[in-house]
Amino acid sequence: MAVEKTNASSSLVEVIDRILDKGVCIDAWARVSLVGIELLAIEARVVVASVDTFLKYAEAVGLTTTATAMHA
């Protein structure tokens, strides 16, 4: 995947449109510990994309066939 670089500024609408078109995956992990004792651990995976983009990539990796087989 090539990264496109432009010098022009983008409006918020253009940025949101691009995120929904391409999709964004955010993987975050945090741990809070005190004196070597883990107090809190947070793991999050967030995917932001349009339904059309999700279905296109889900079909490419075979996720849609599993869902169809479950409902049949």
Swiss-Prot record:
Compartment annotation: Gas vesicle shell
Keyword vocabulary terms for this entry: Gas vesicle
Any matching Pfam family: Gas_vesicle
Source superkingdom: Bacteria
Protein's UniProt keywords contain Protein biosynthesis: no
GO cellular component: gas vesicle shell; vesicle membrane
Recorded GO MF terms: structural molecule activity
Family named by the database record: Belongs to the gas vesicle GvpA family.
Function: Gas vesicles are hollow, gas filled proteinaceous nanostructures found in some microorganisms. During planktonic growth they allow positioning of the organism at a favorable depth for light or nutrient acquisition. GvpA forms the protein shell.
Identification of the protein by name: Gas vesicle protein A
Source species of the chain: Geotalea uraniireducens (strain Rf4) (Geobacter uraniireducens)
